[in-house]
A protein has these predicted regions:
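N-terminal hydrophobic/helix-forming segments and targeting peptides
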Residues: 1-187
Length: 187
């Protein structure tokens, strides 16, 4: 899951951070985040100075947990290196559609489970491996490890893709309600 990493606790209690993975800067300002410390989870909100708001500049954004000093933050167990993720709930929309953070990877996991259930008791003339990997957003590390161990002849990745039809054009790739979207890459 994409997220943030705390890089510094400022004297005024605000937290500097960097992005982990591809996150749109303009989606950050005002967003609630969940910070995972070594002992607990805390909620904060992303705030920004005026220039950062205008320019969507992460360098001018901070996470505010309601603390007024560095010591208050440290007393909560937060330290540089802790990570944060966007705080978003799974929400059912109309017409059997959902809204959720990190839904793409979760959909892929569900599809893998559905595939295994459908193939239960079926004799295959090849070895089938189904797995879930981590760190897709920062260099495909989990997938790289899995392929290095298994050495597959073919790999099929089950993942969600962006719906591009929000632009209002009917020829966009990835339209909701228009069937399965298959993207391919041959290397």
């Amino acid at each position: 899951e994409v997220g943030l990493m705390i890089t510094e606790i400022q004297e005024n209690g605000l937290l500097s951070f960097i992005k982990i993975g591809p996150i749109e800067e303009k989606a950050l300002y005002g967003s609630r985040v969940r910070i995972q410390t070594r002992e607990k989870e805390m909620v904060g909100v992303i705030t920004a100075d005026e220039d950062a708001m205008k320019n969507n500049d992460v360098k001018g954004m901070r996470i505010d947990i309601g603390a007024s000093s560095k010591e208050e933050v440290q007393a909560q167990g937060i330290m540089a290196g802790d990570t944060a993720v966007m705080d978003g709930e799974y929400t059912m929309l109309h017409q059997n559609r959902i809204m959720a953070k990190a839904a793409d990877a979760r959909q892929g996991c569900v599809l893998g489970l559905v595939l295994l259930e459908a193939l239960k008791g079926v004799e295959l003339d090849f070895d089938l491996y189904v797995g879930a990997s981590v760190m897709e957003e920062v260099g495909q590390r989990g997938g790289t490890t899995a392929t290095g161990l298994i050495h597959p002849d073919l790999g099929i990745v089950l993942d969600g893709g962006a719906a591009d039809d929000y632009k209002g054009k009917d020829n966009e790739v990835g339209q909701l309600g228009k069937g399965v979207l298959i993207r391919y890459y041959d290397k």
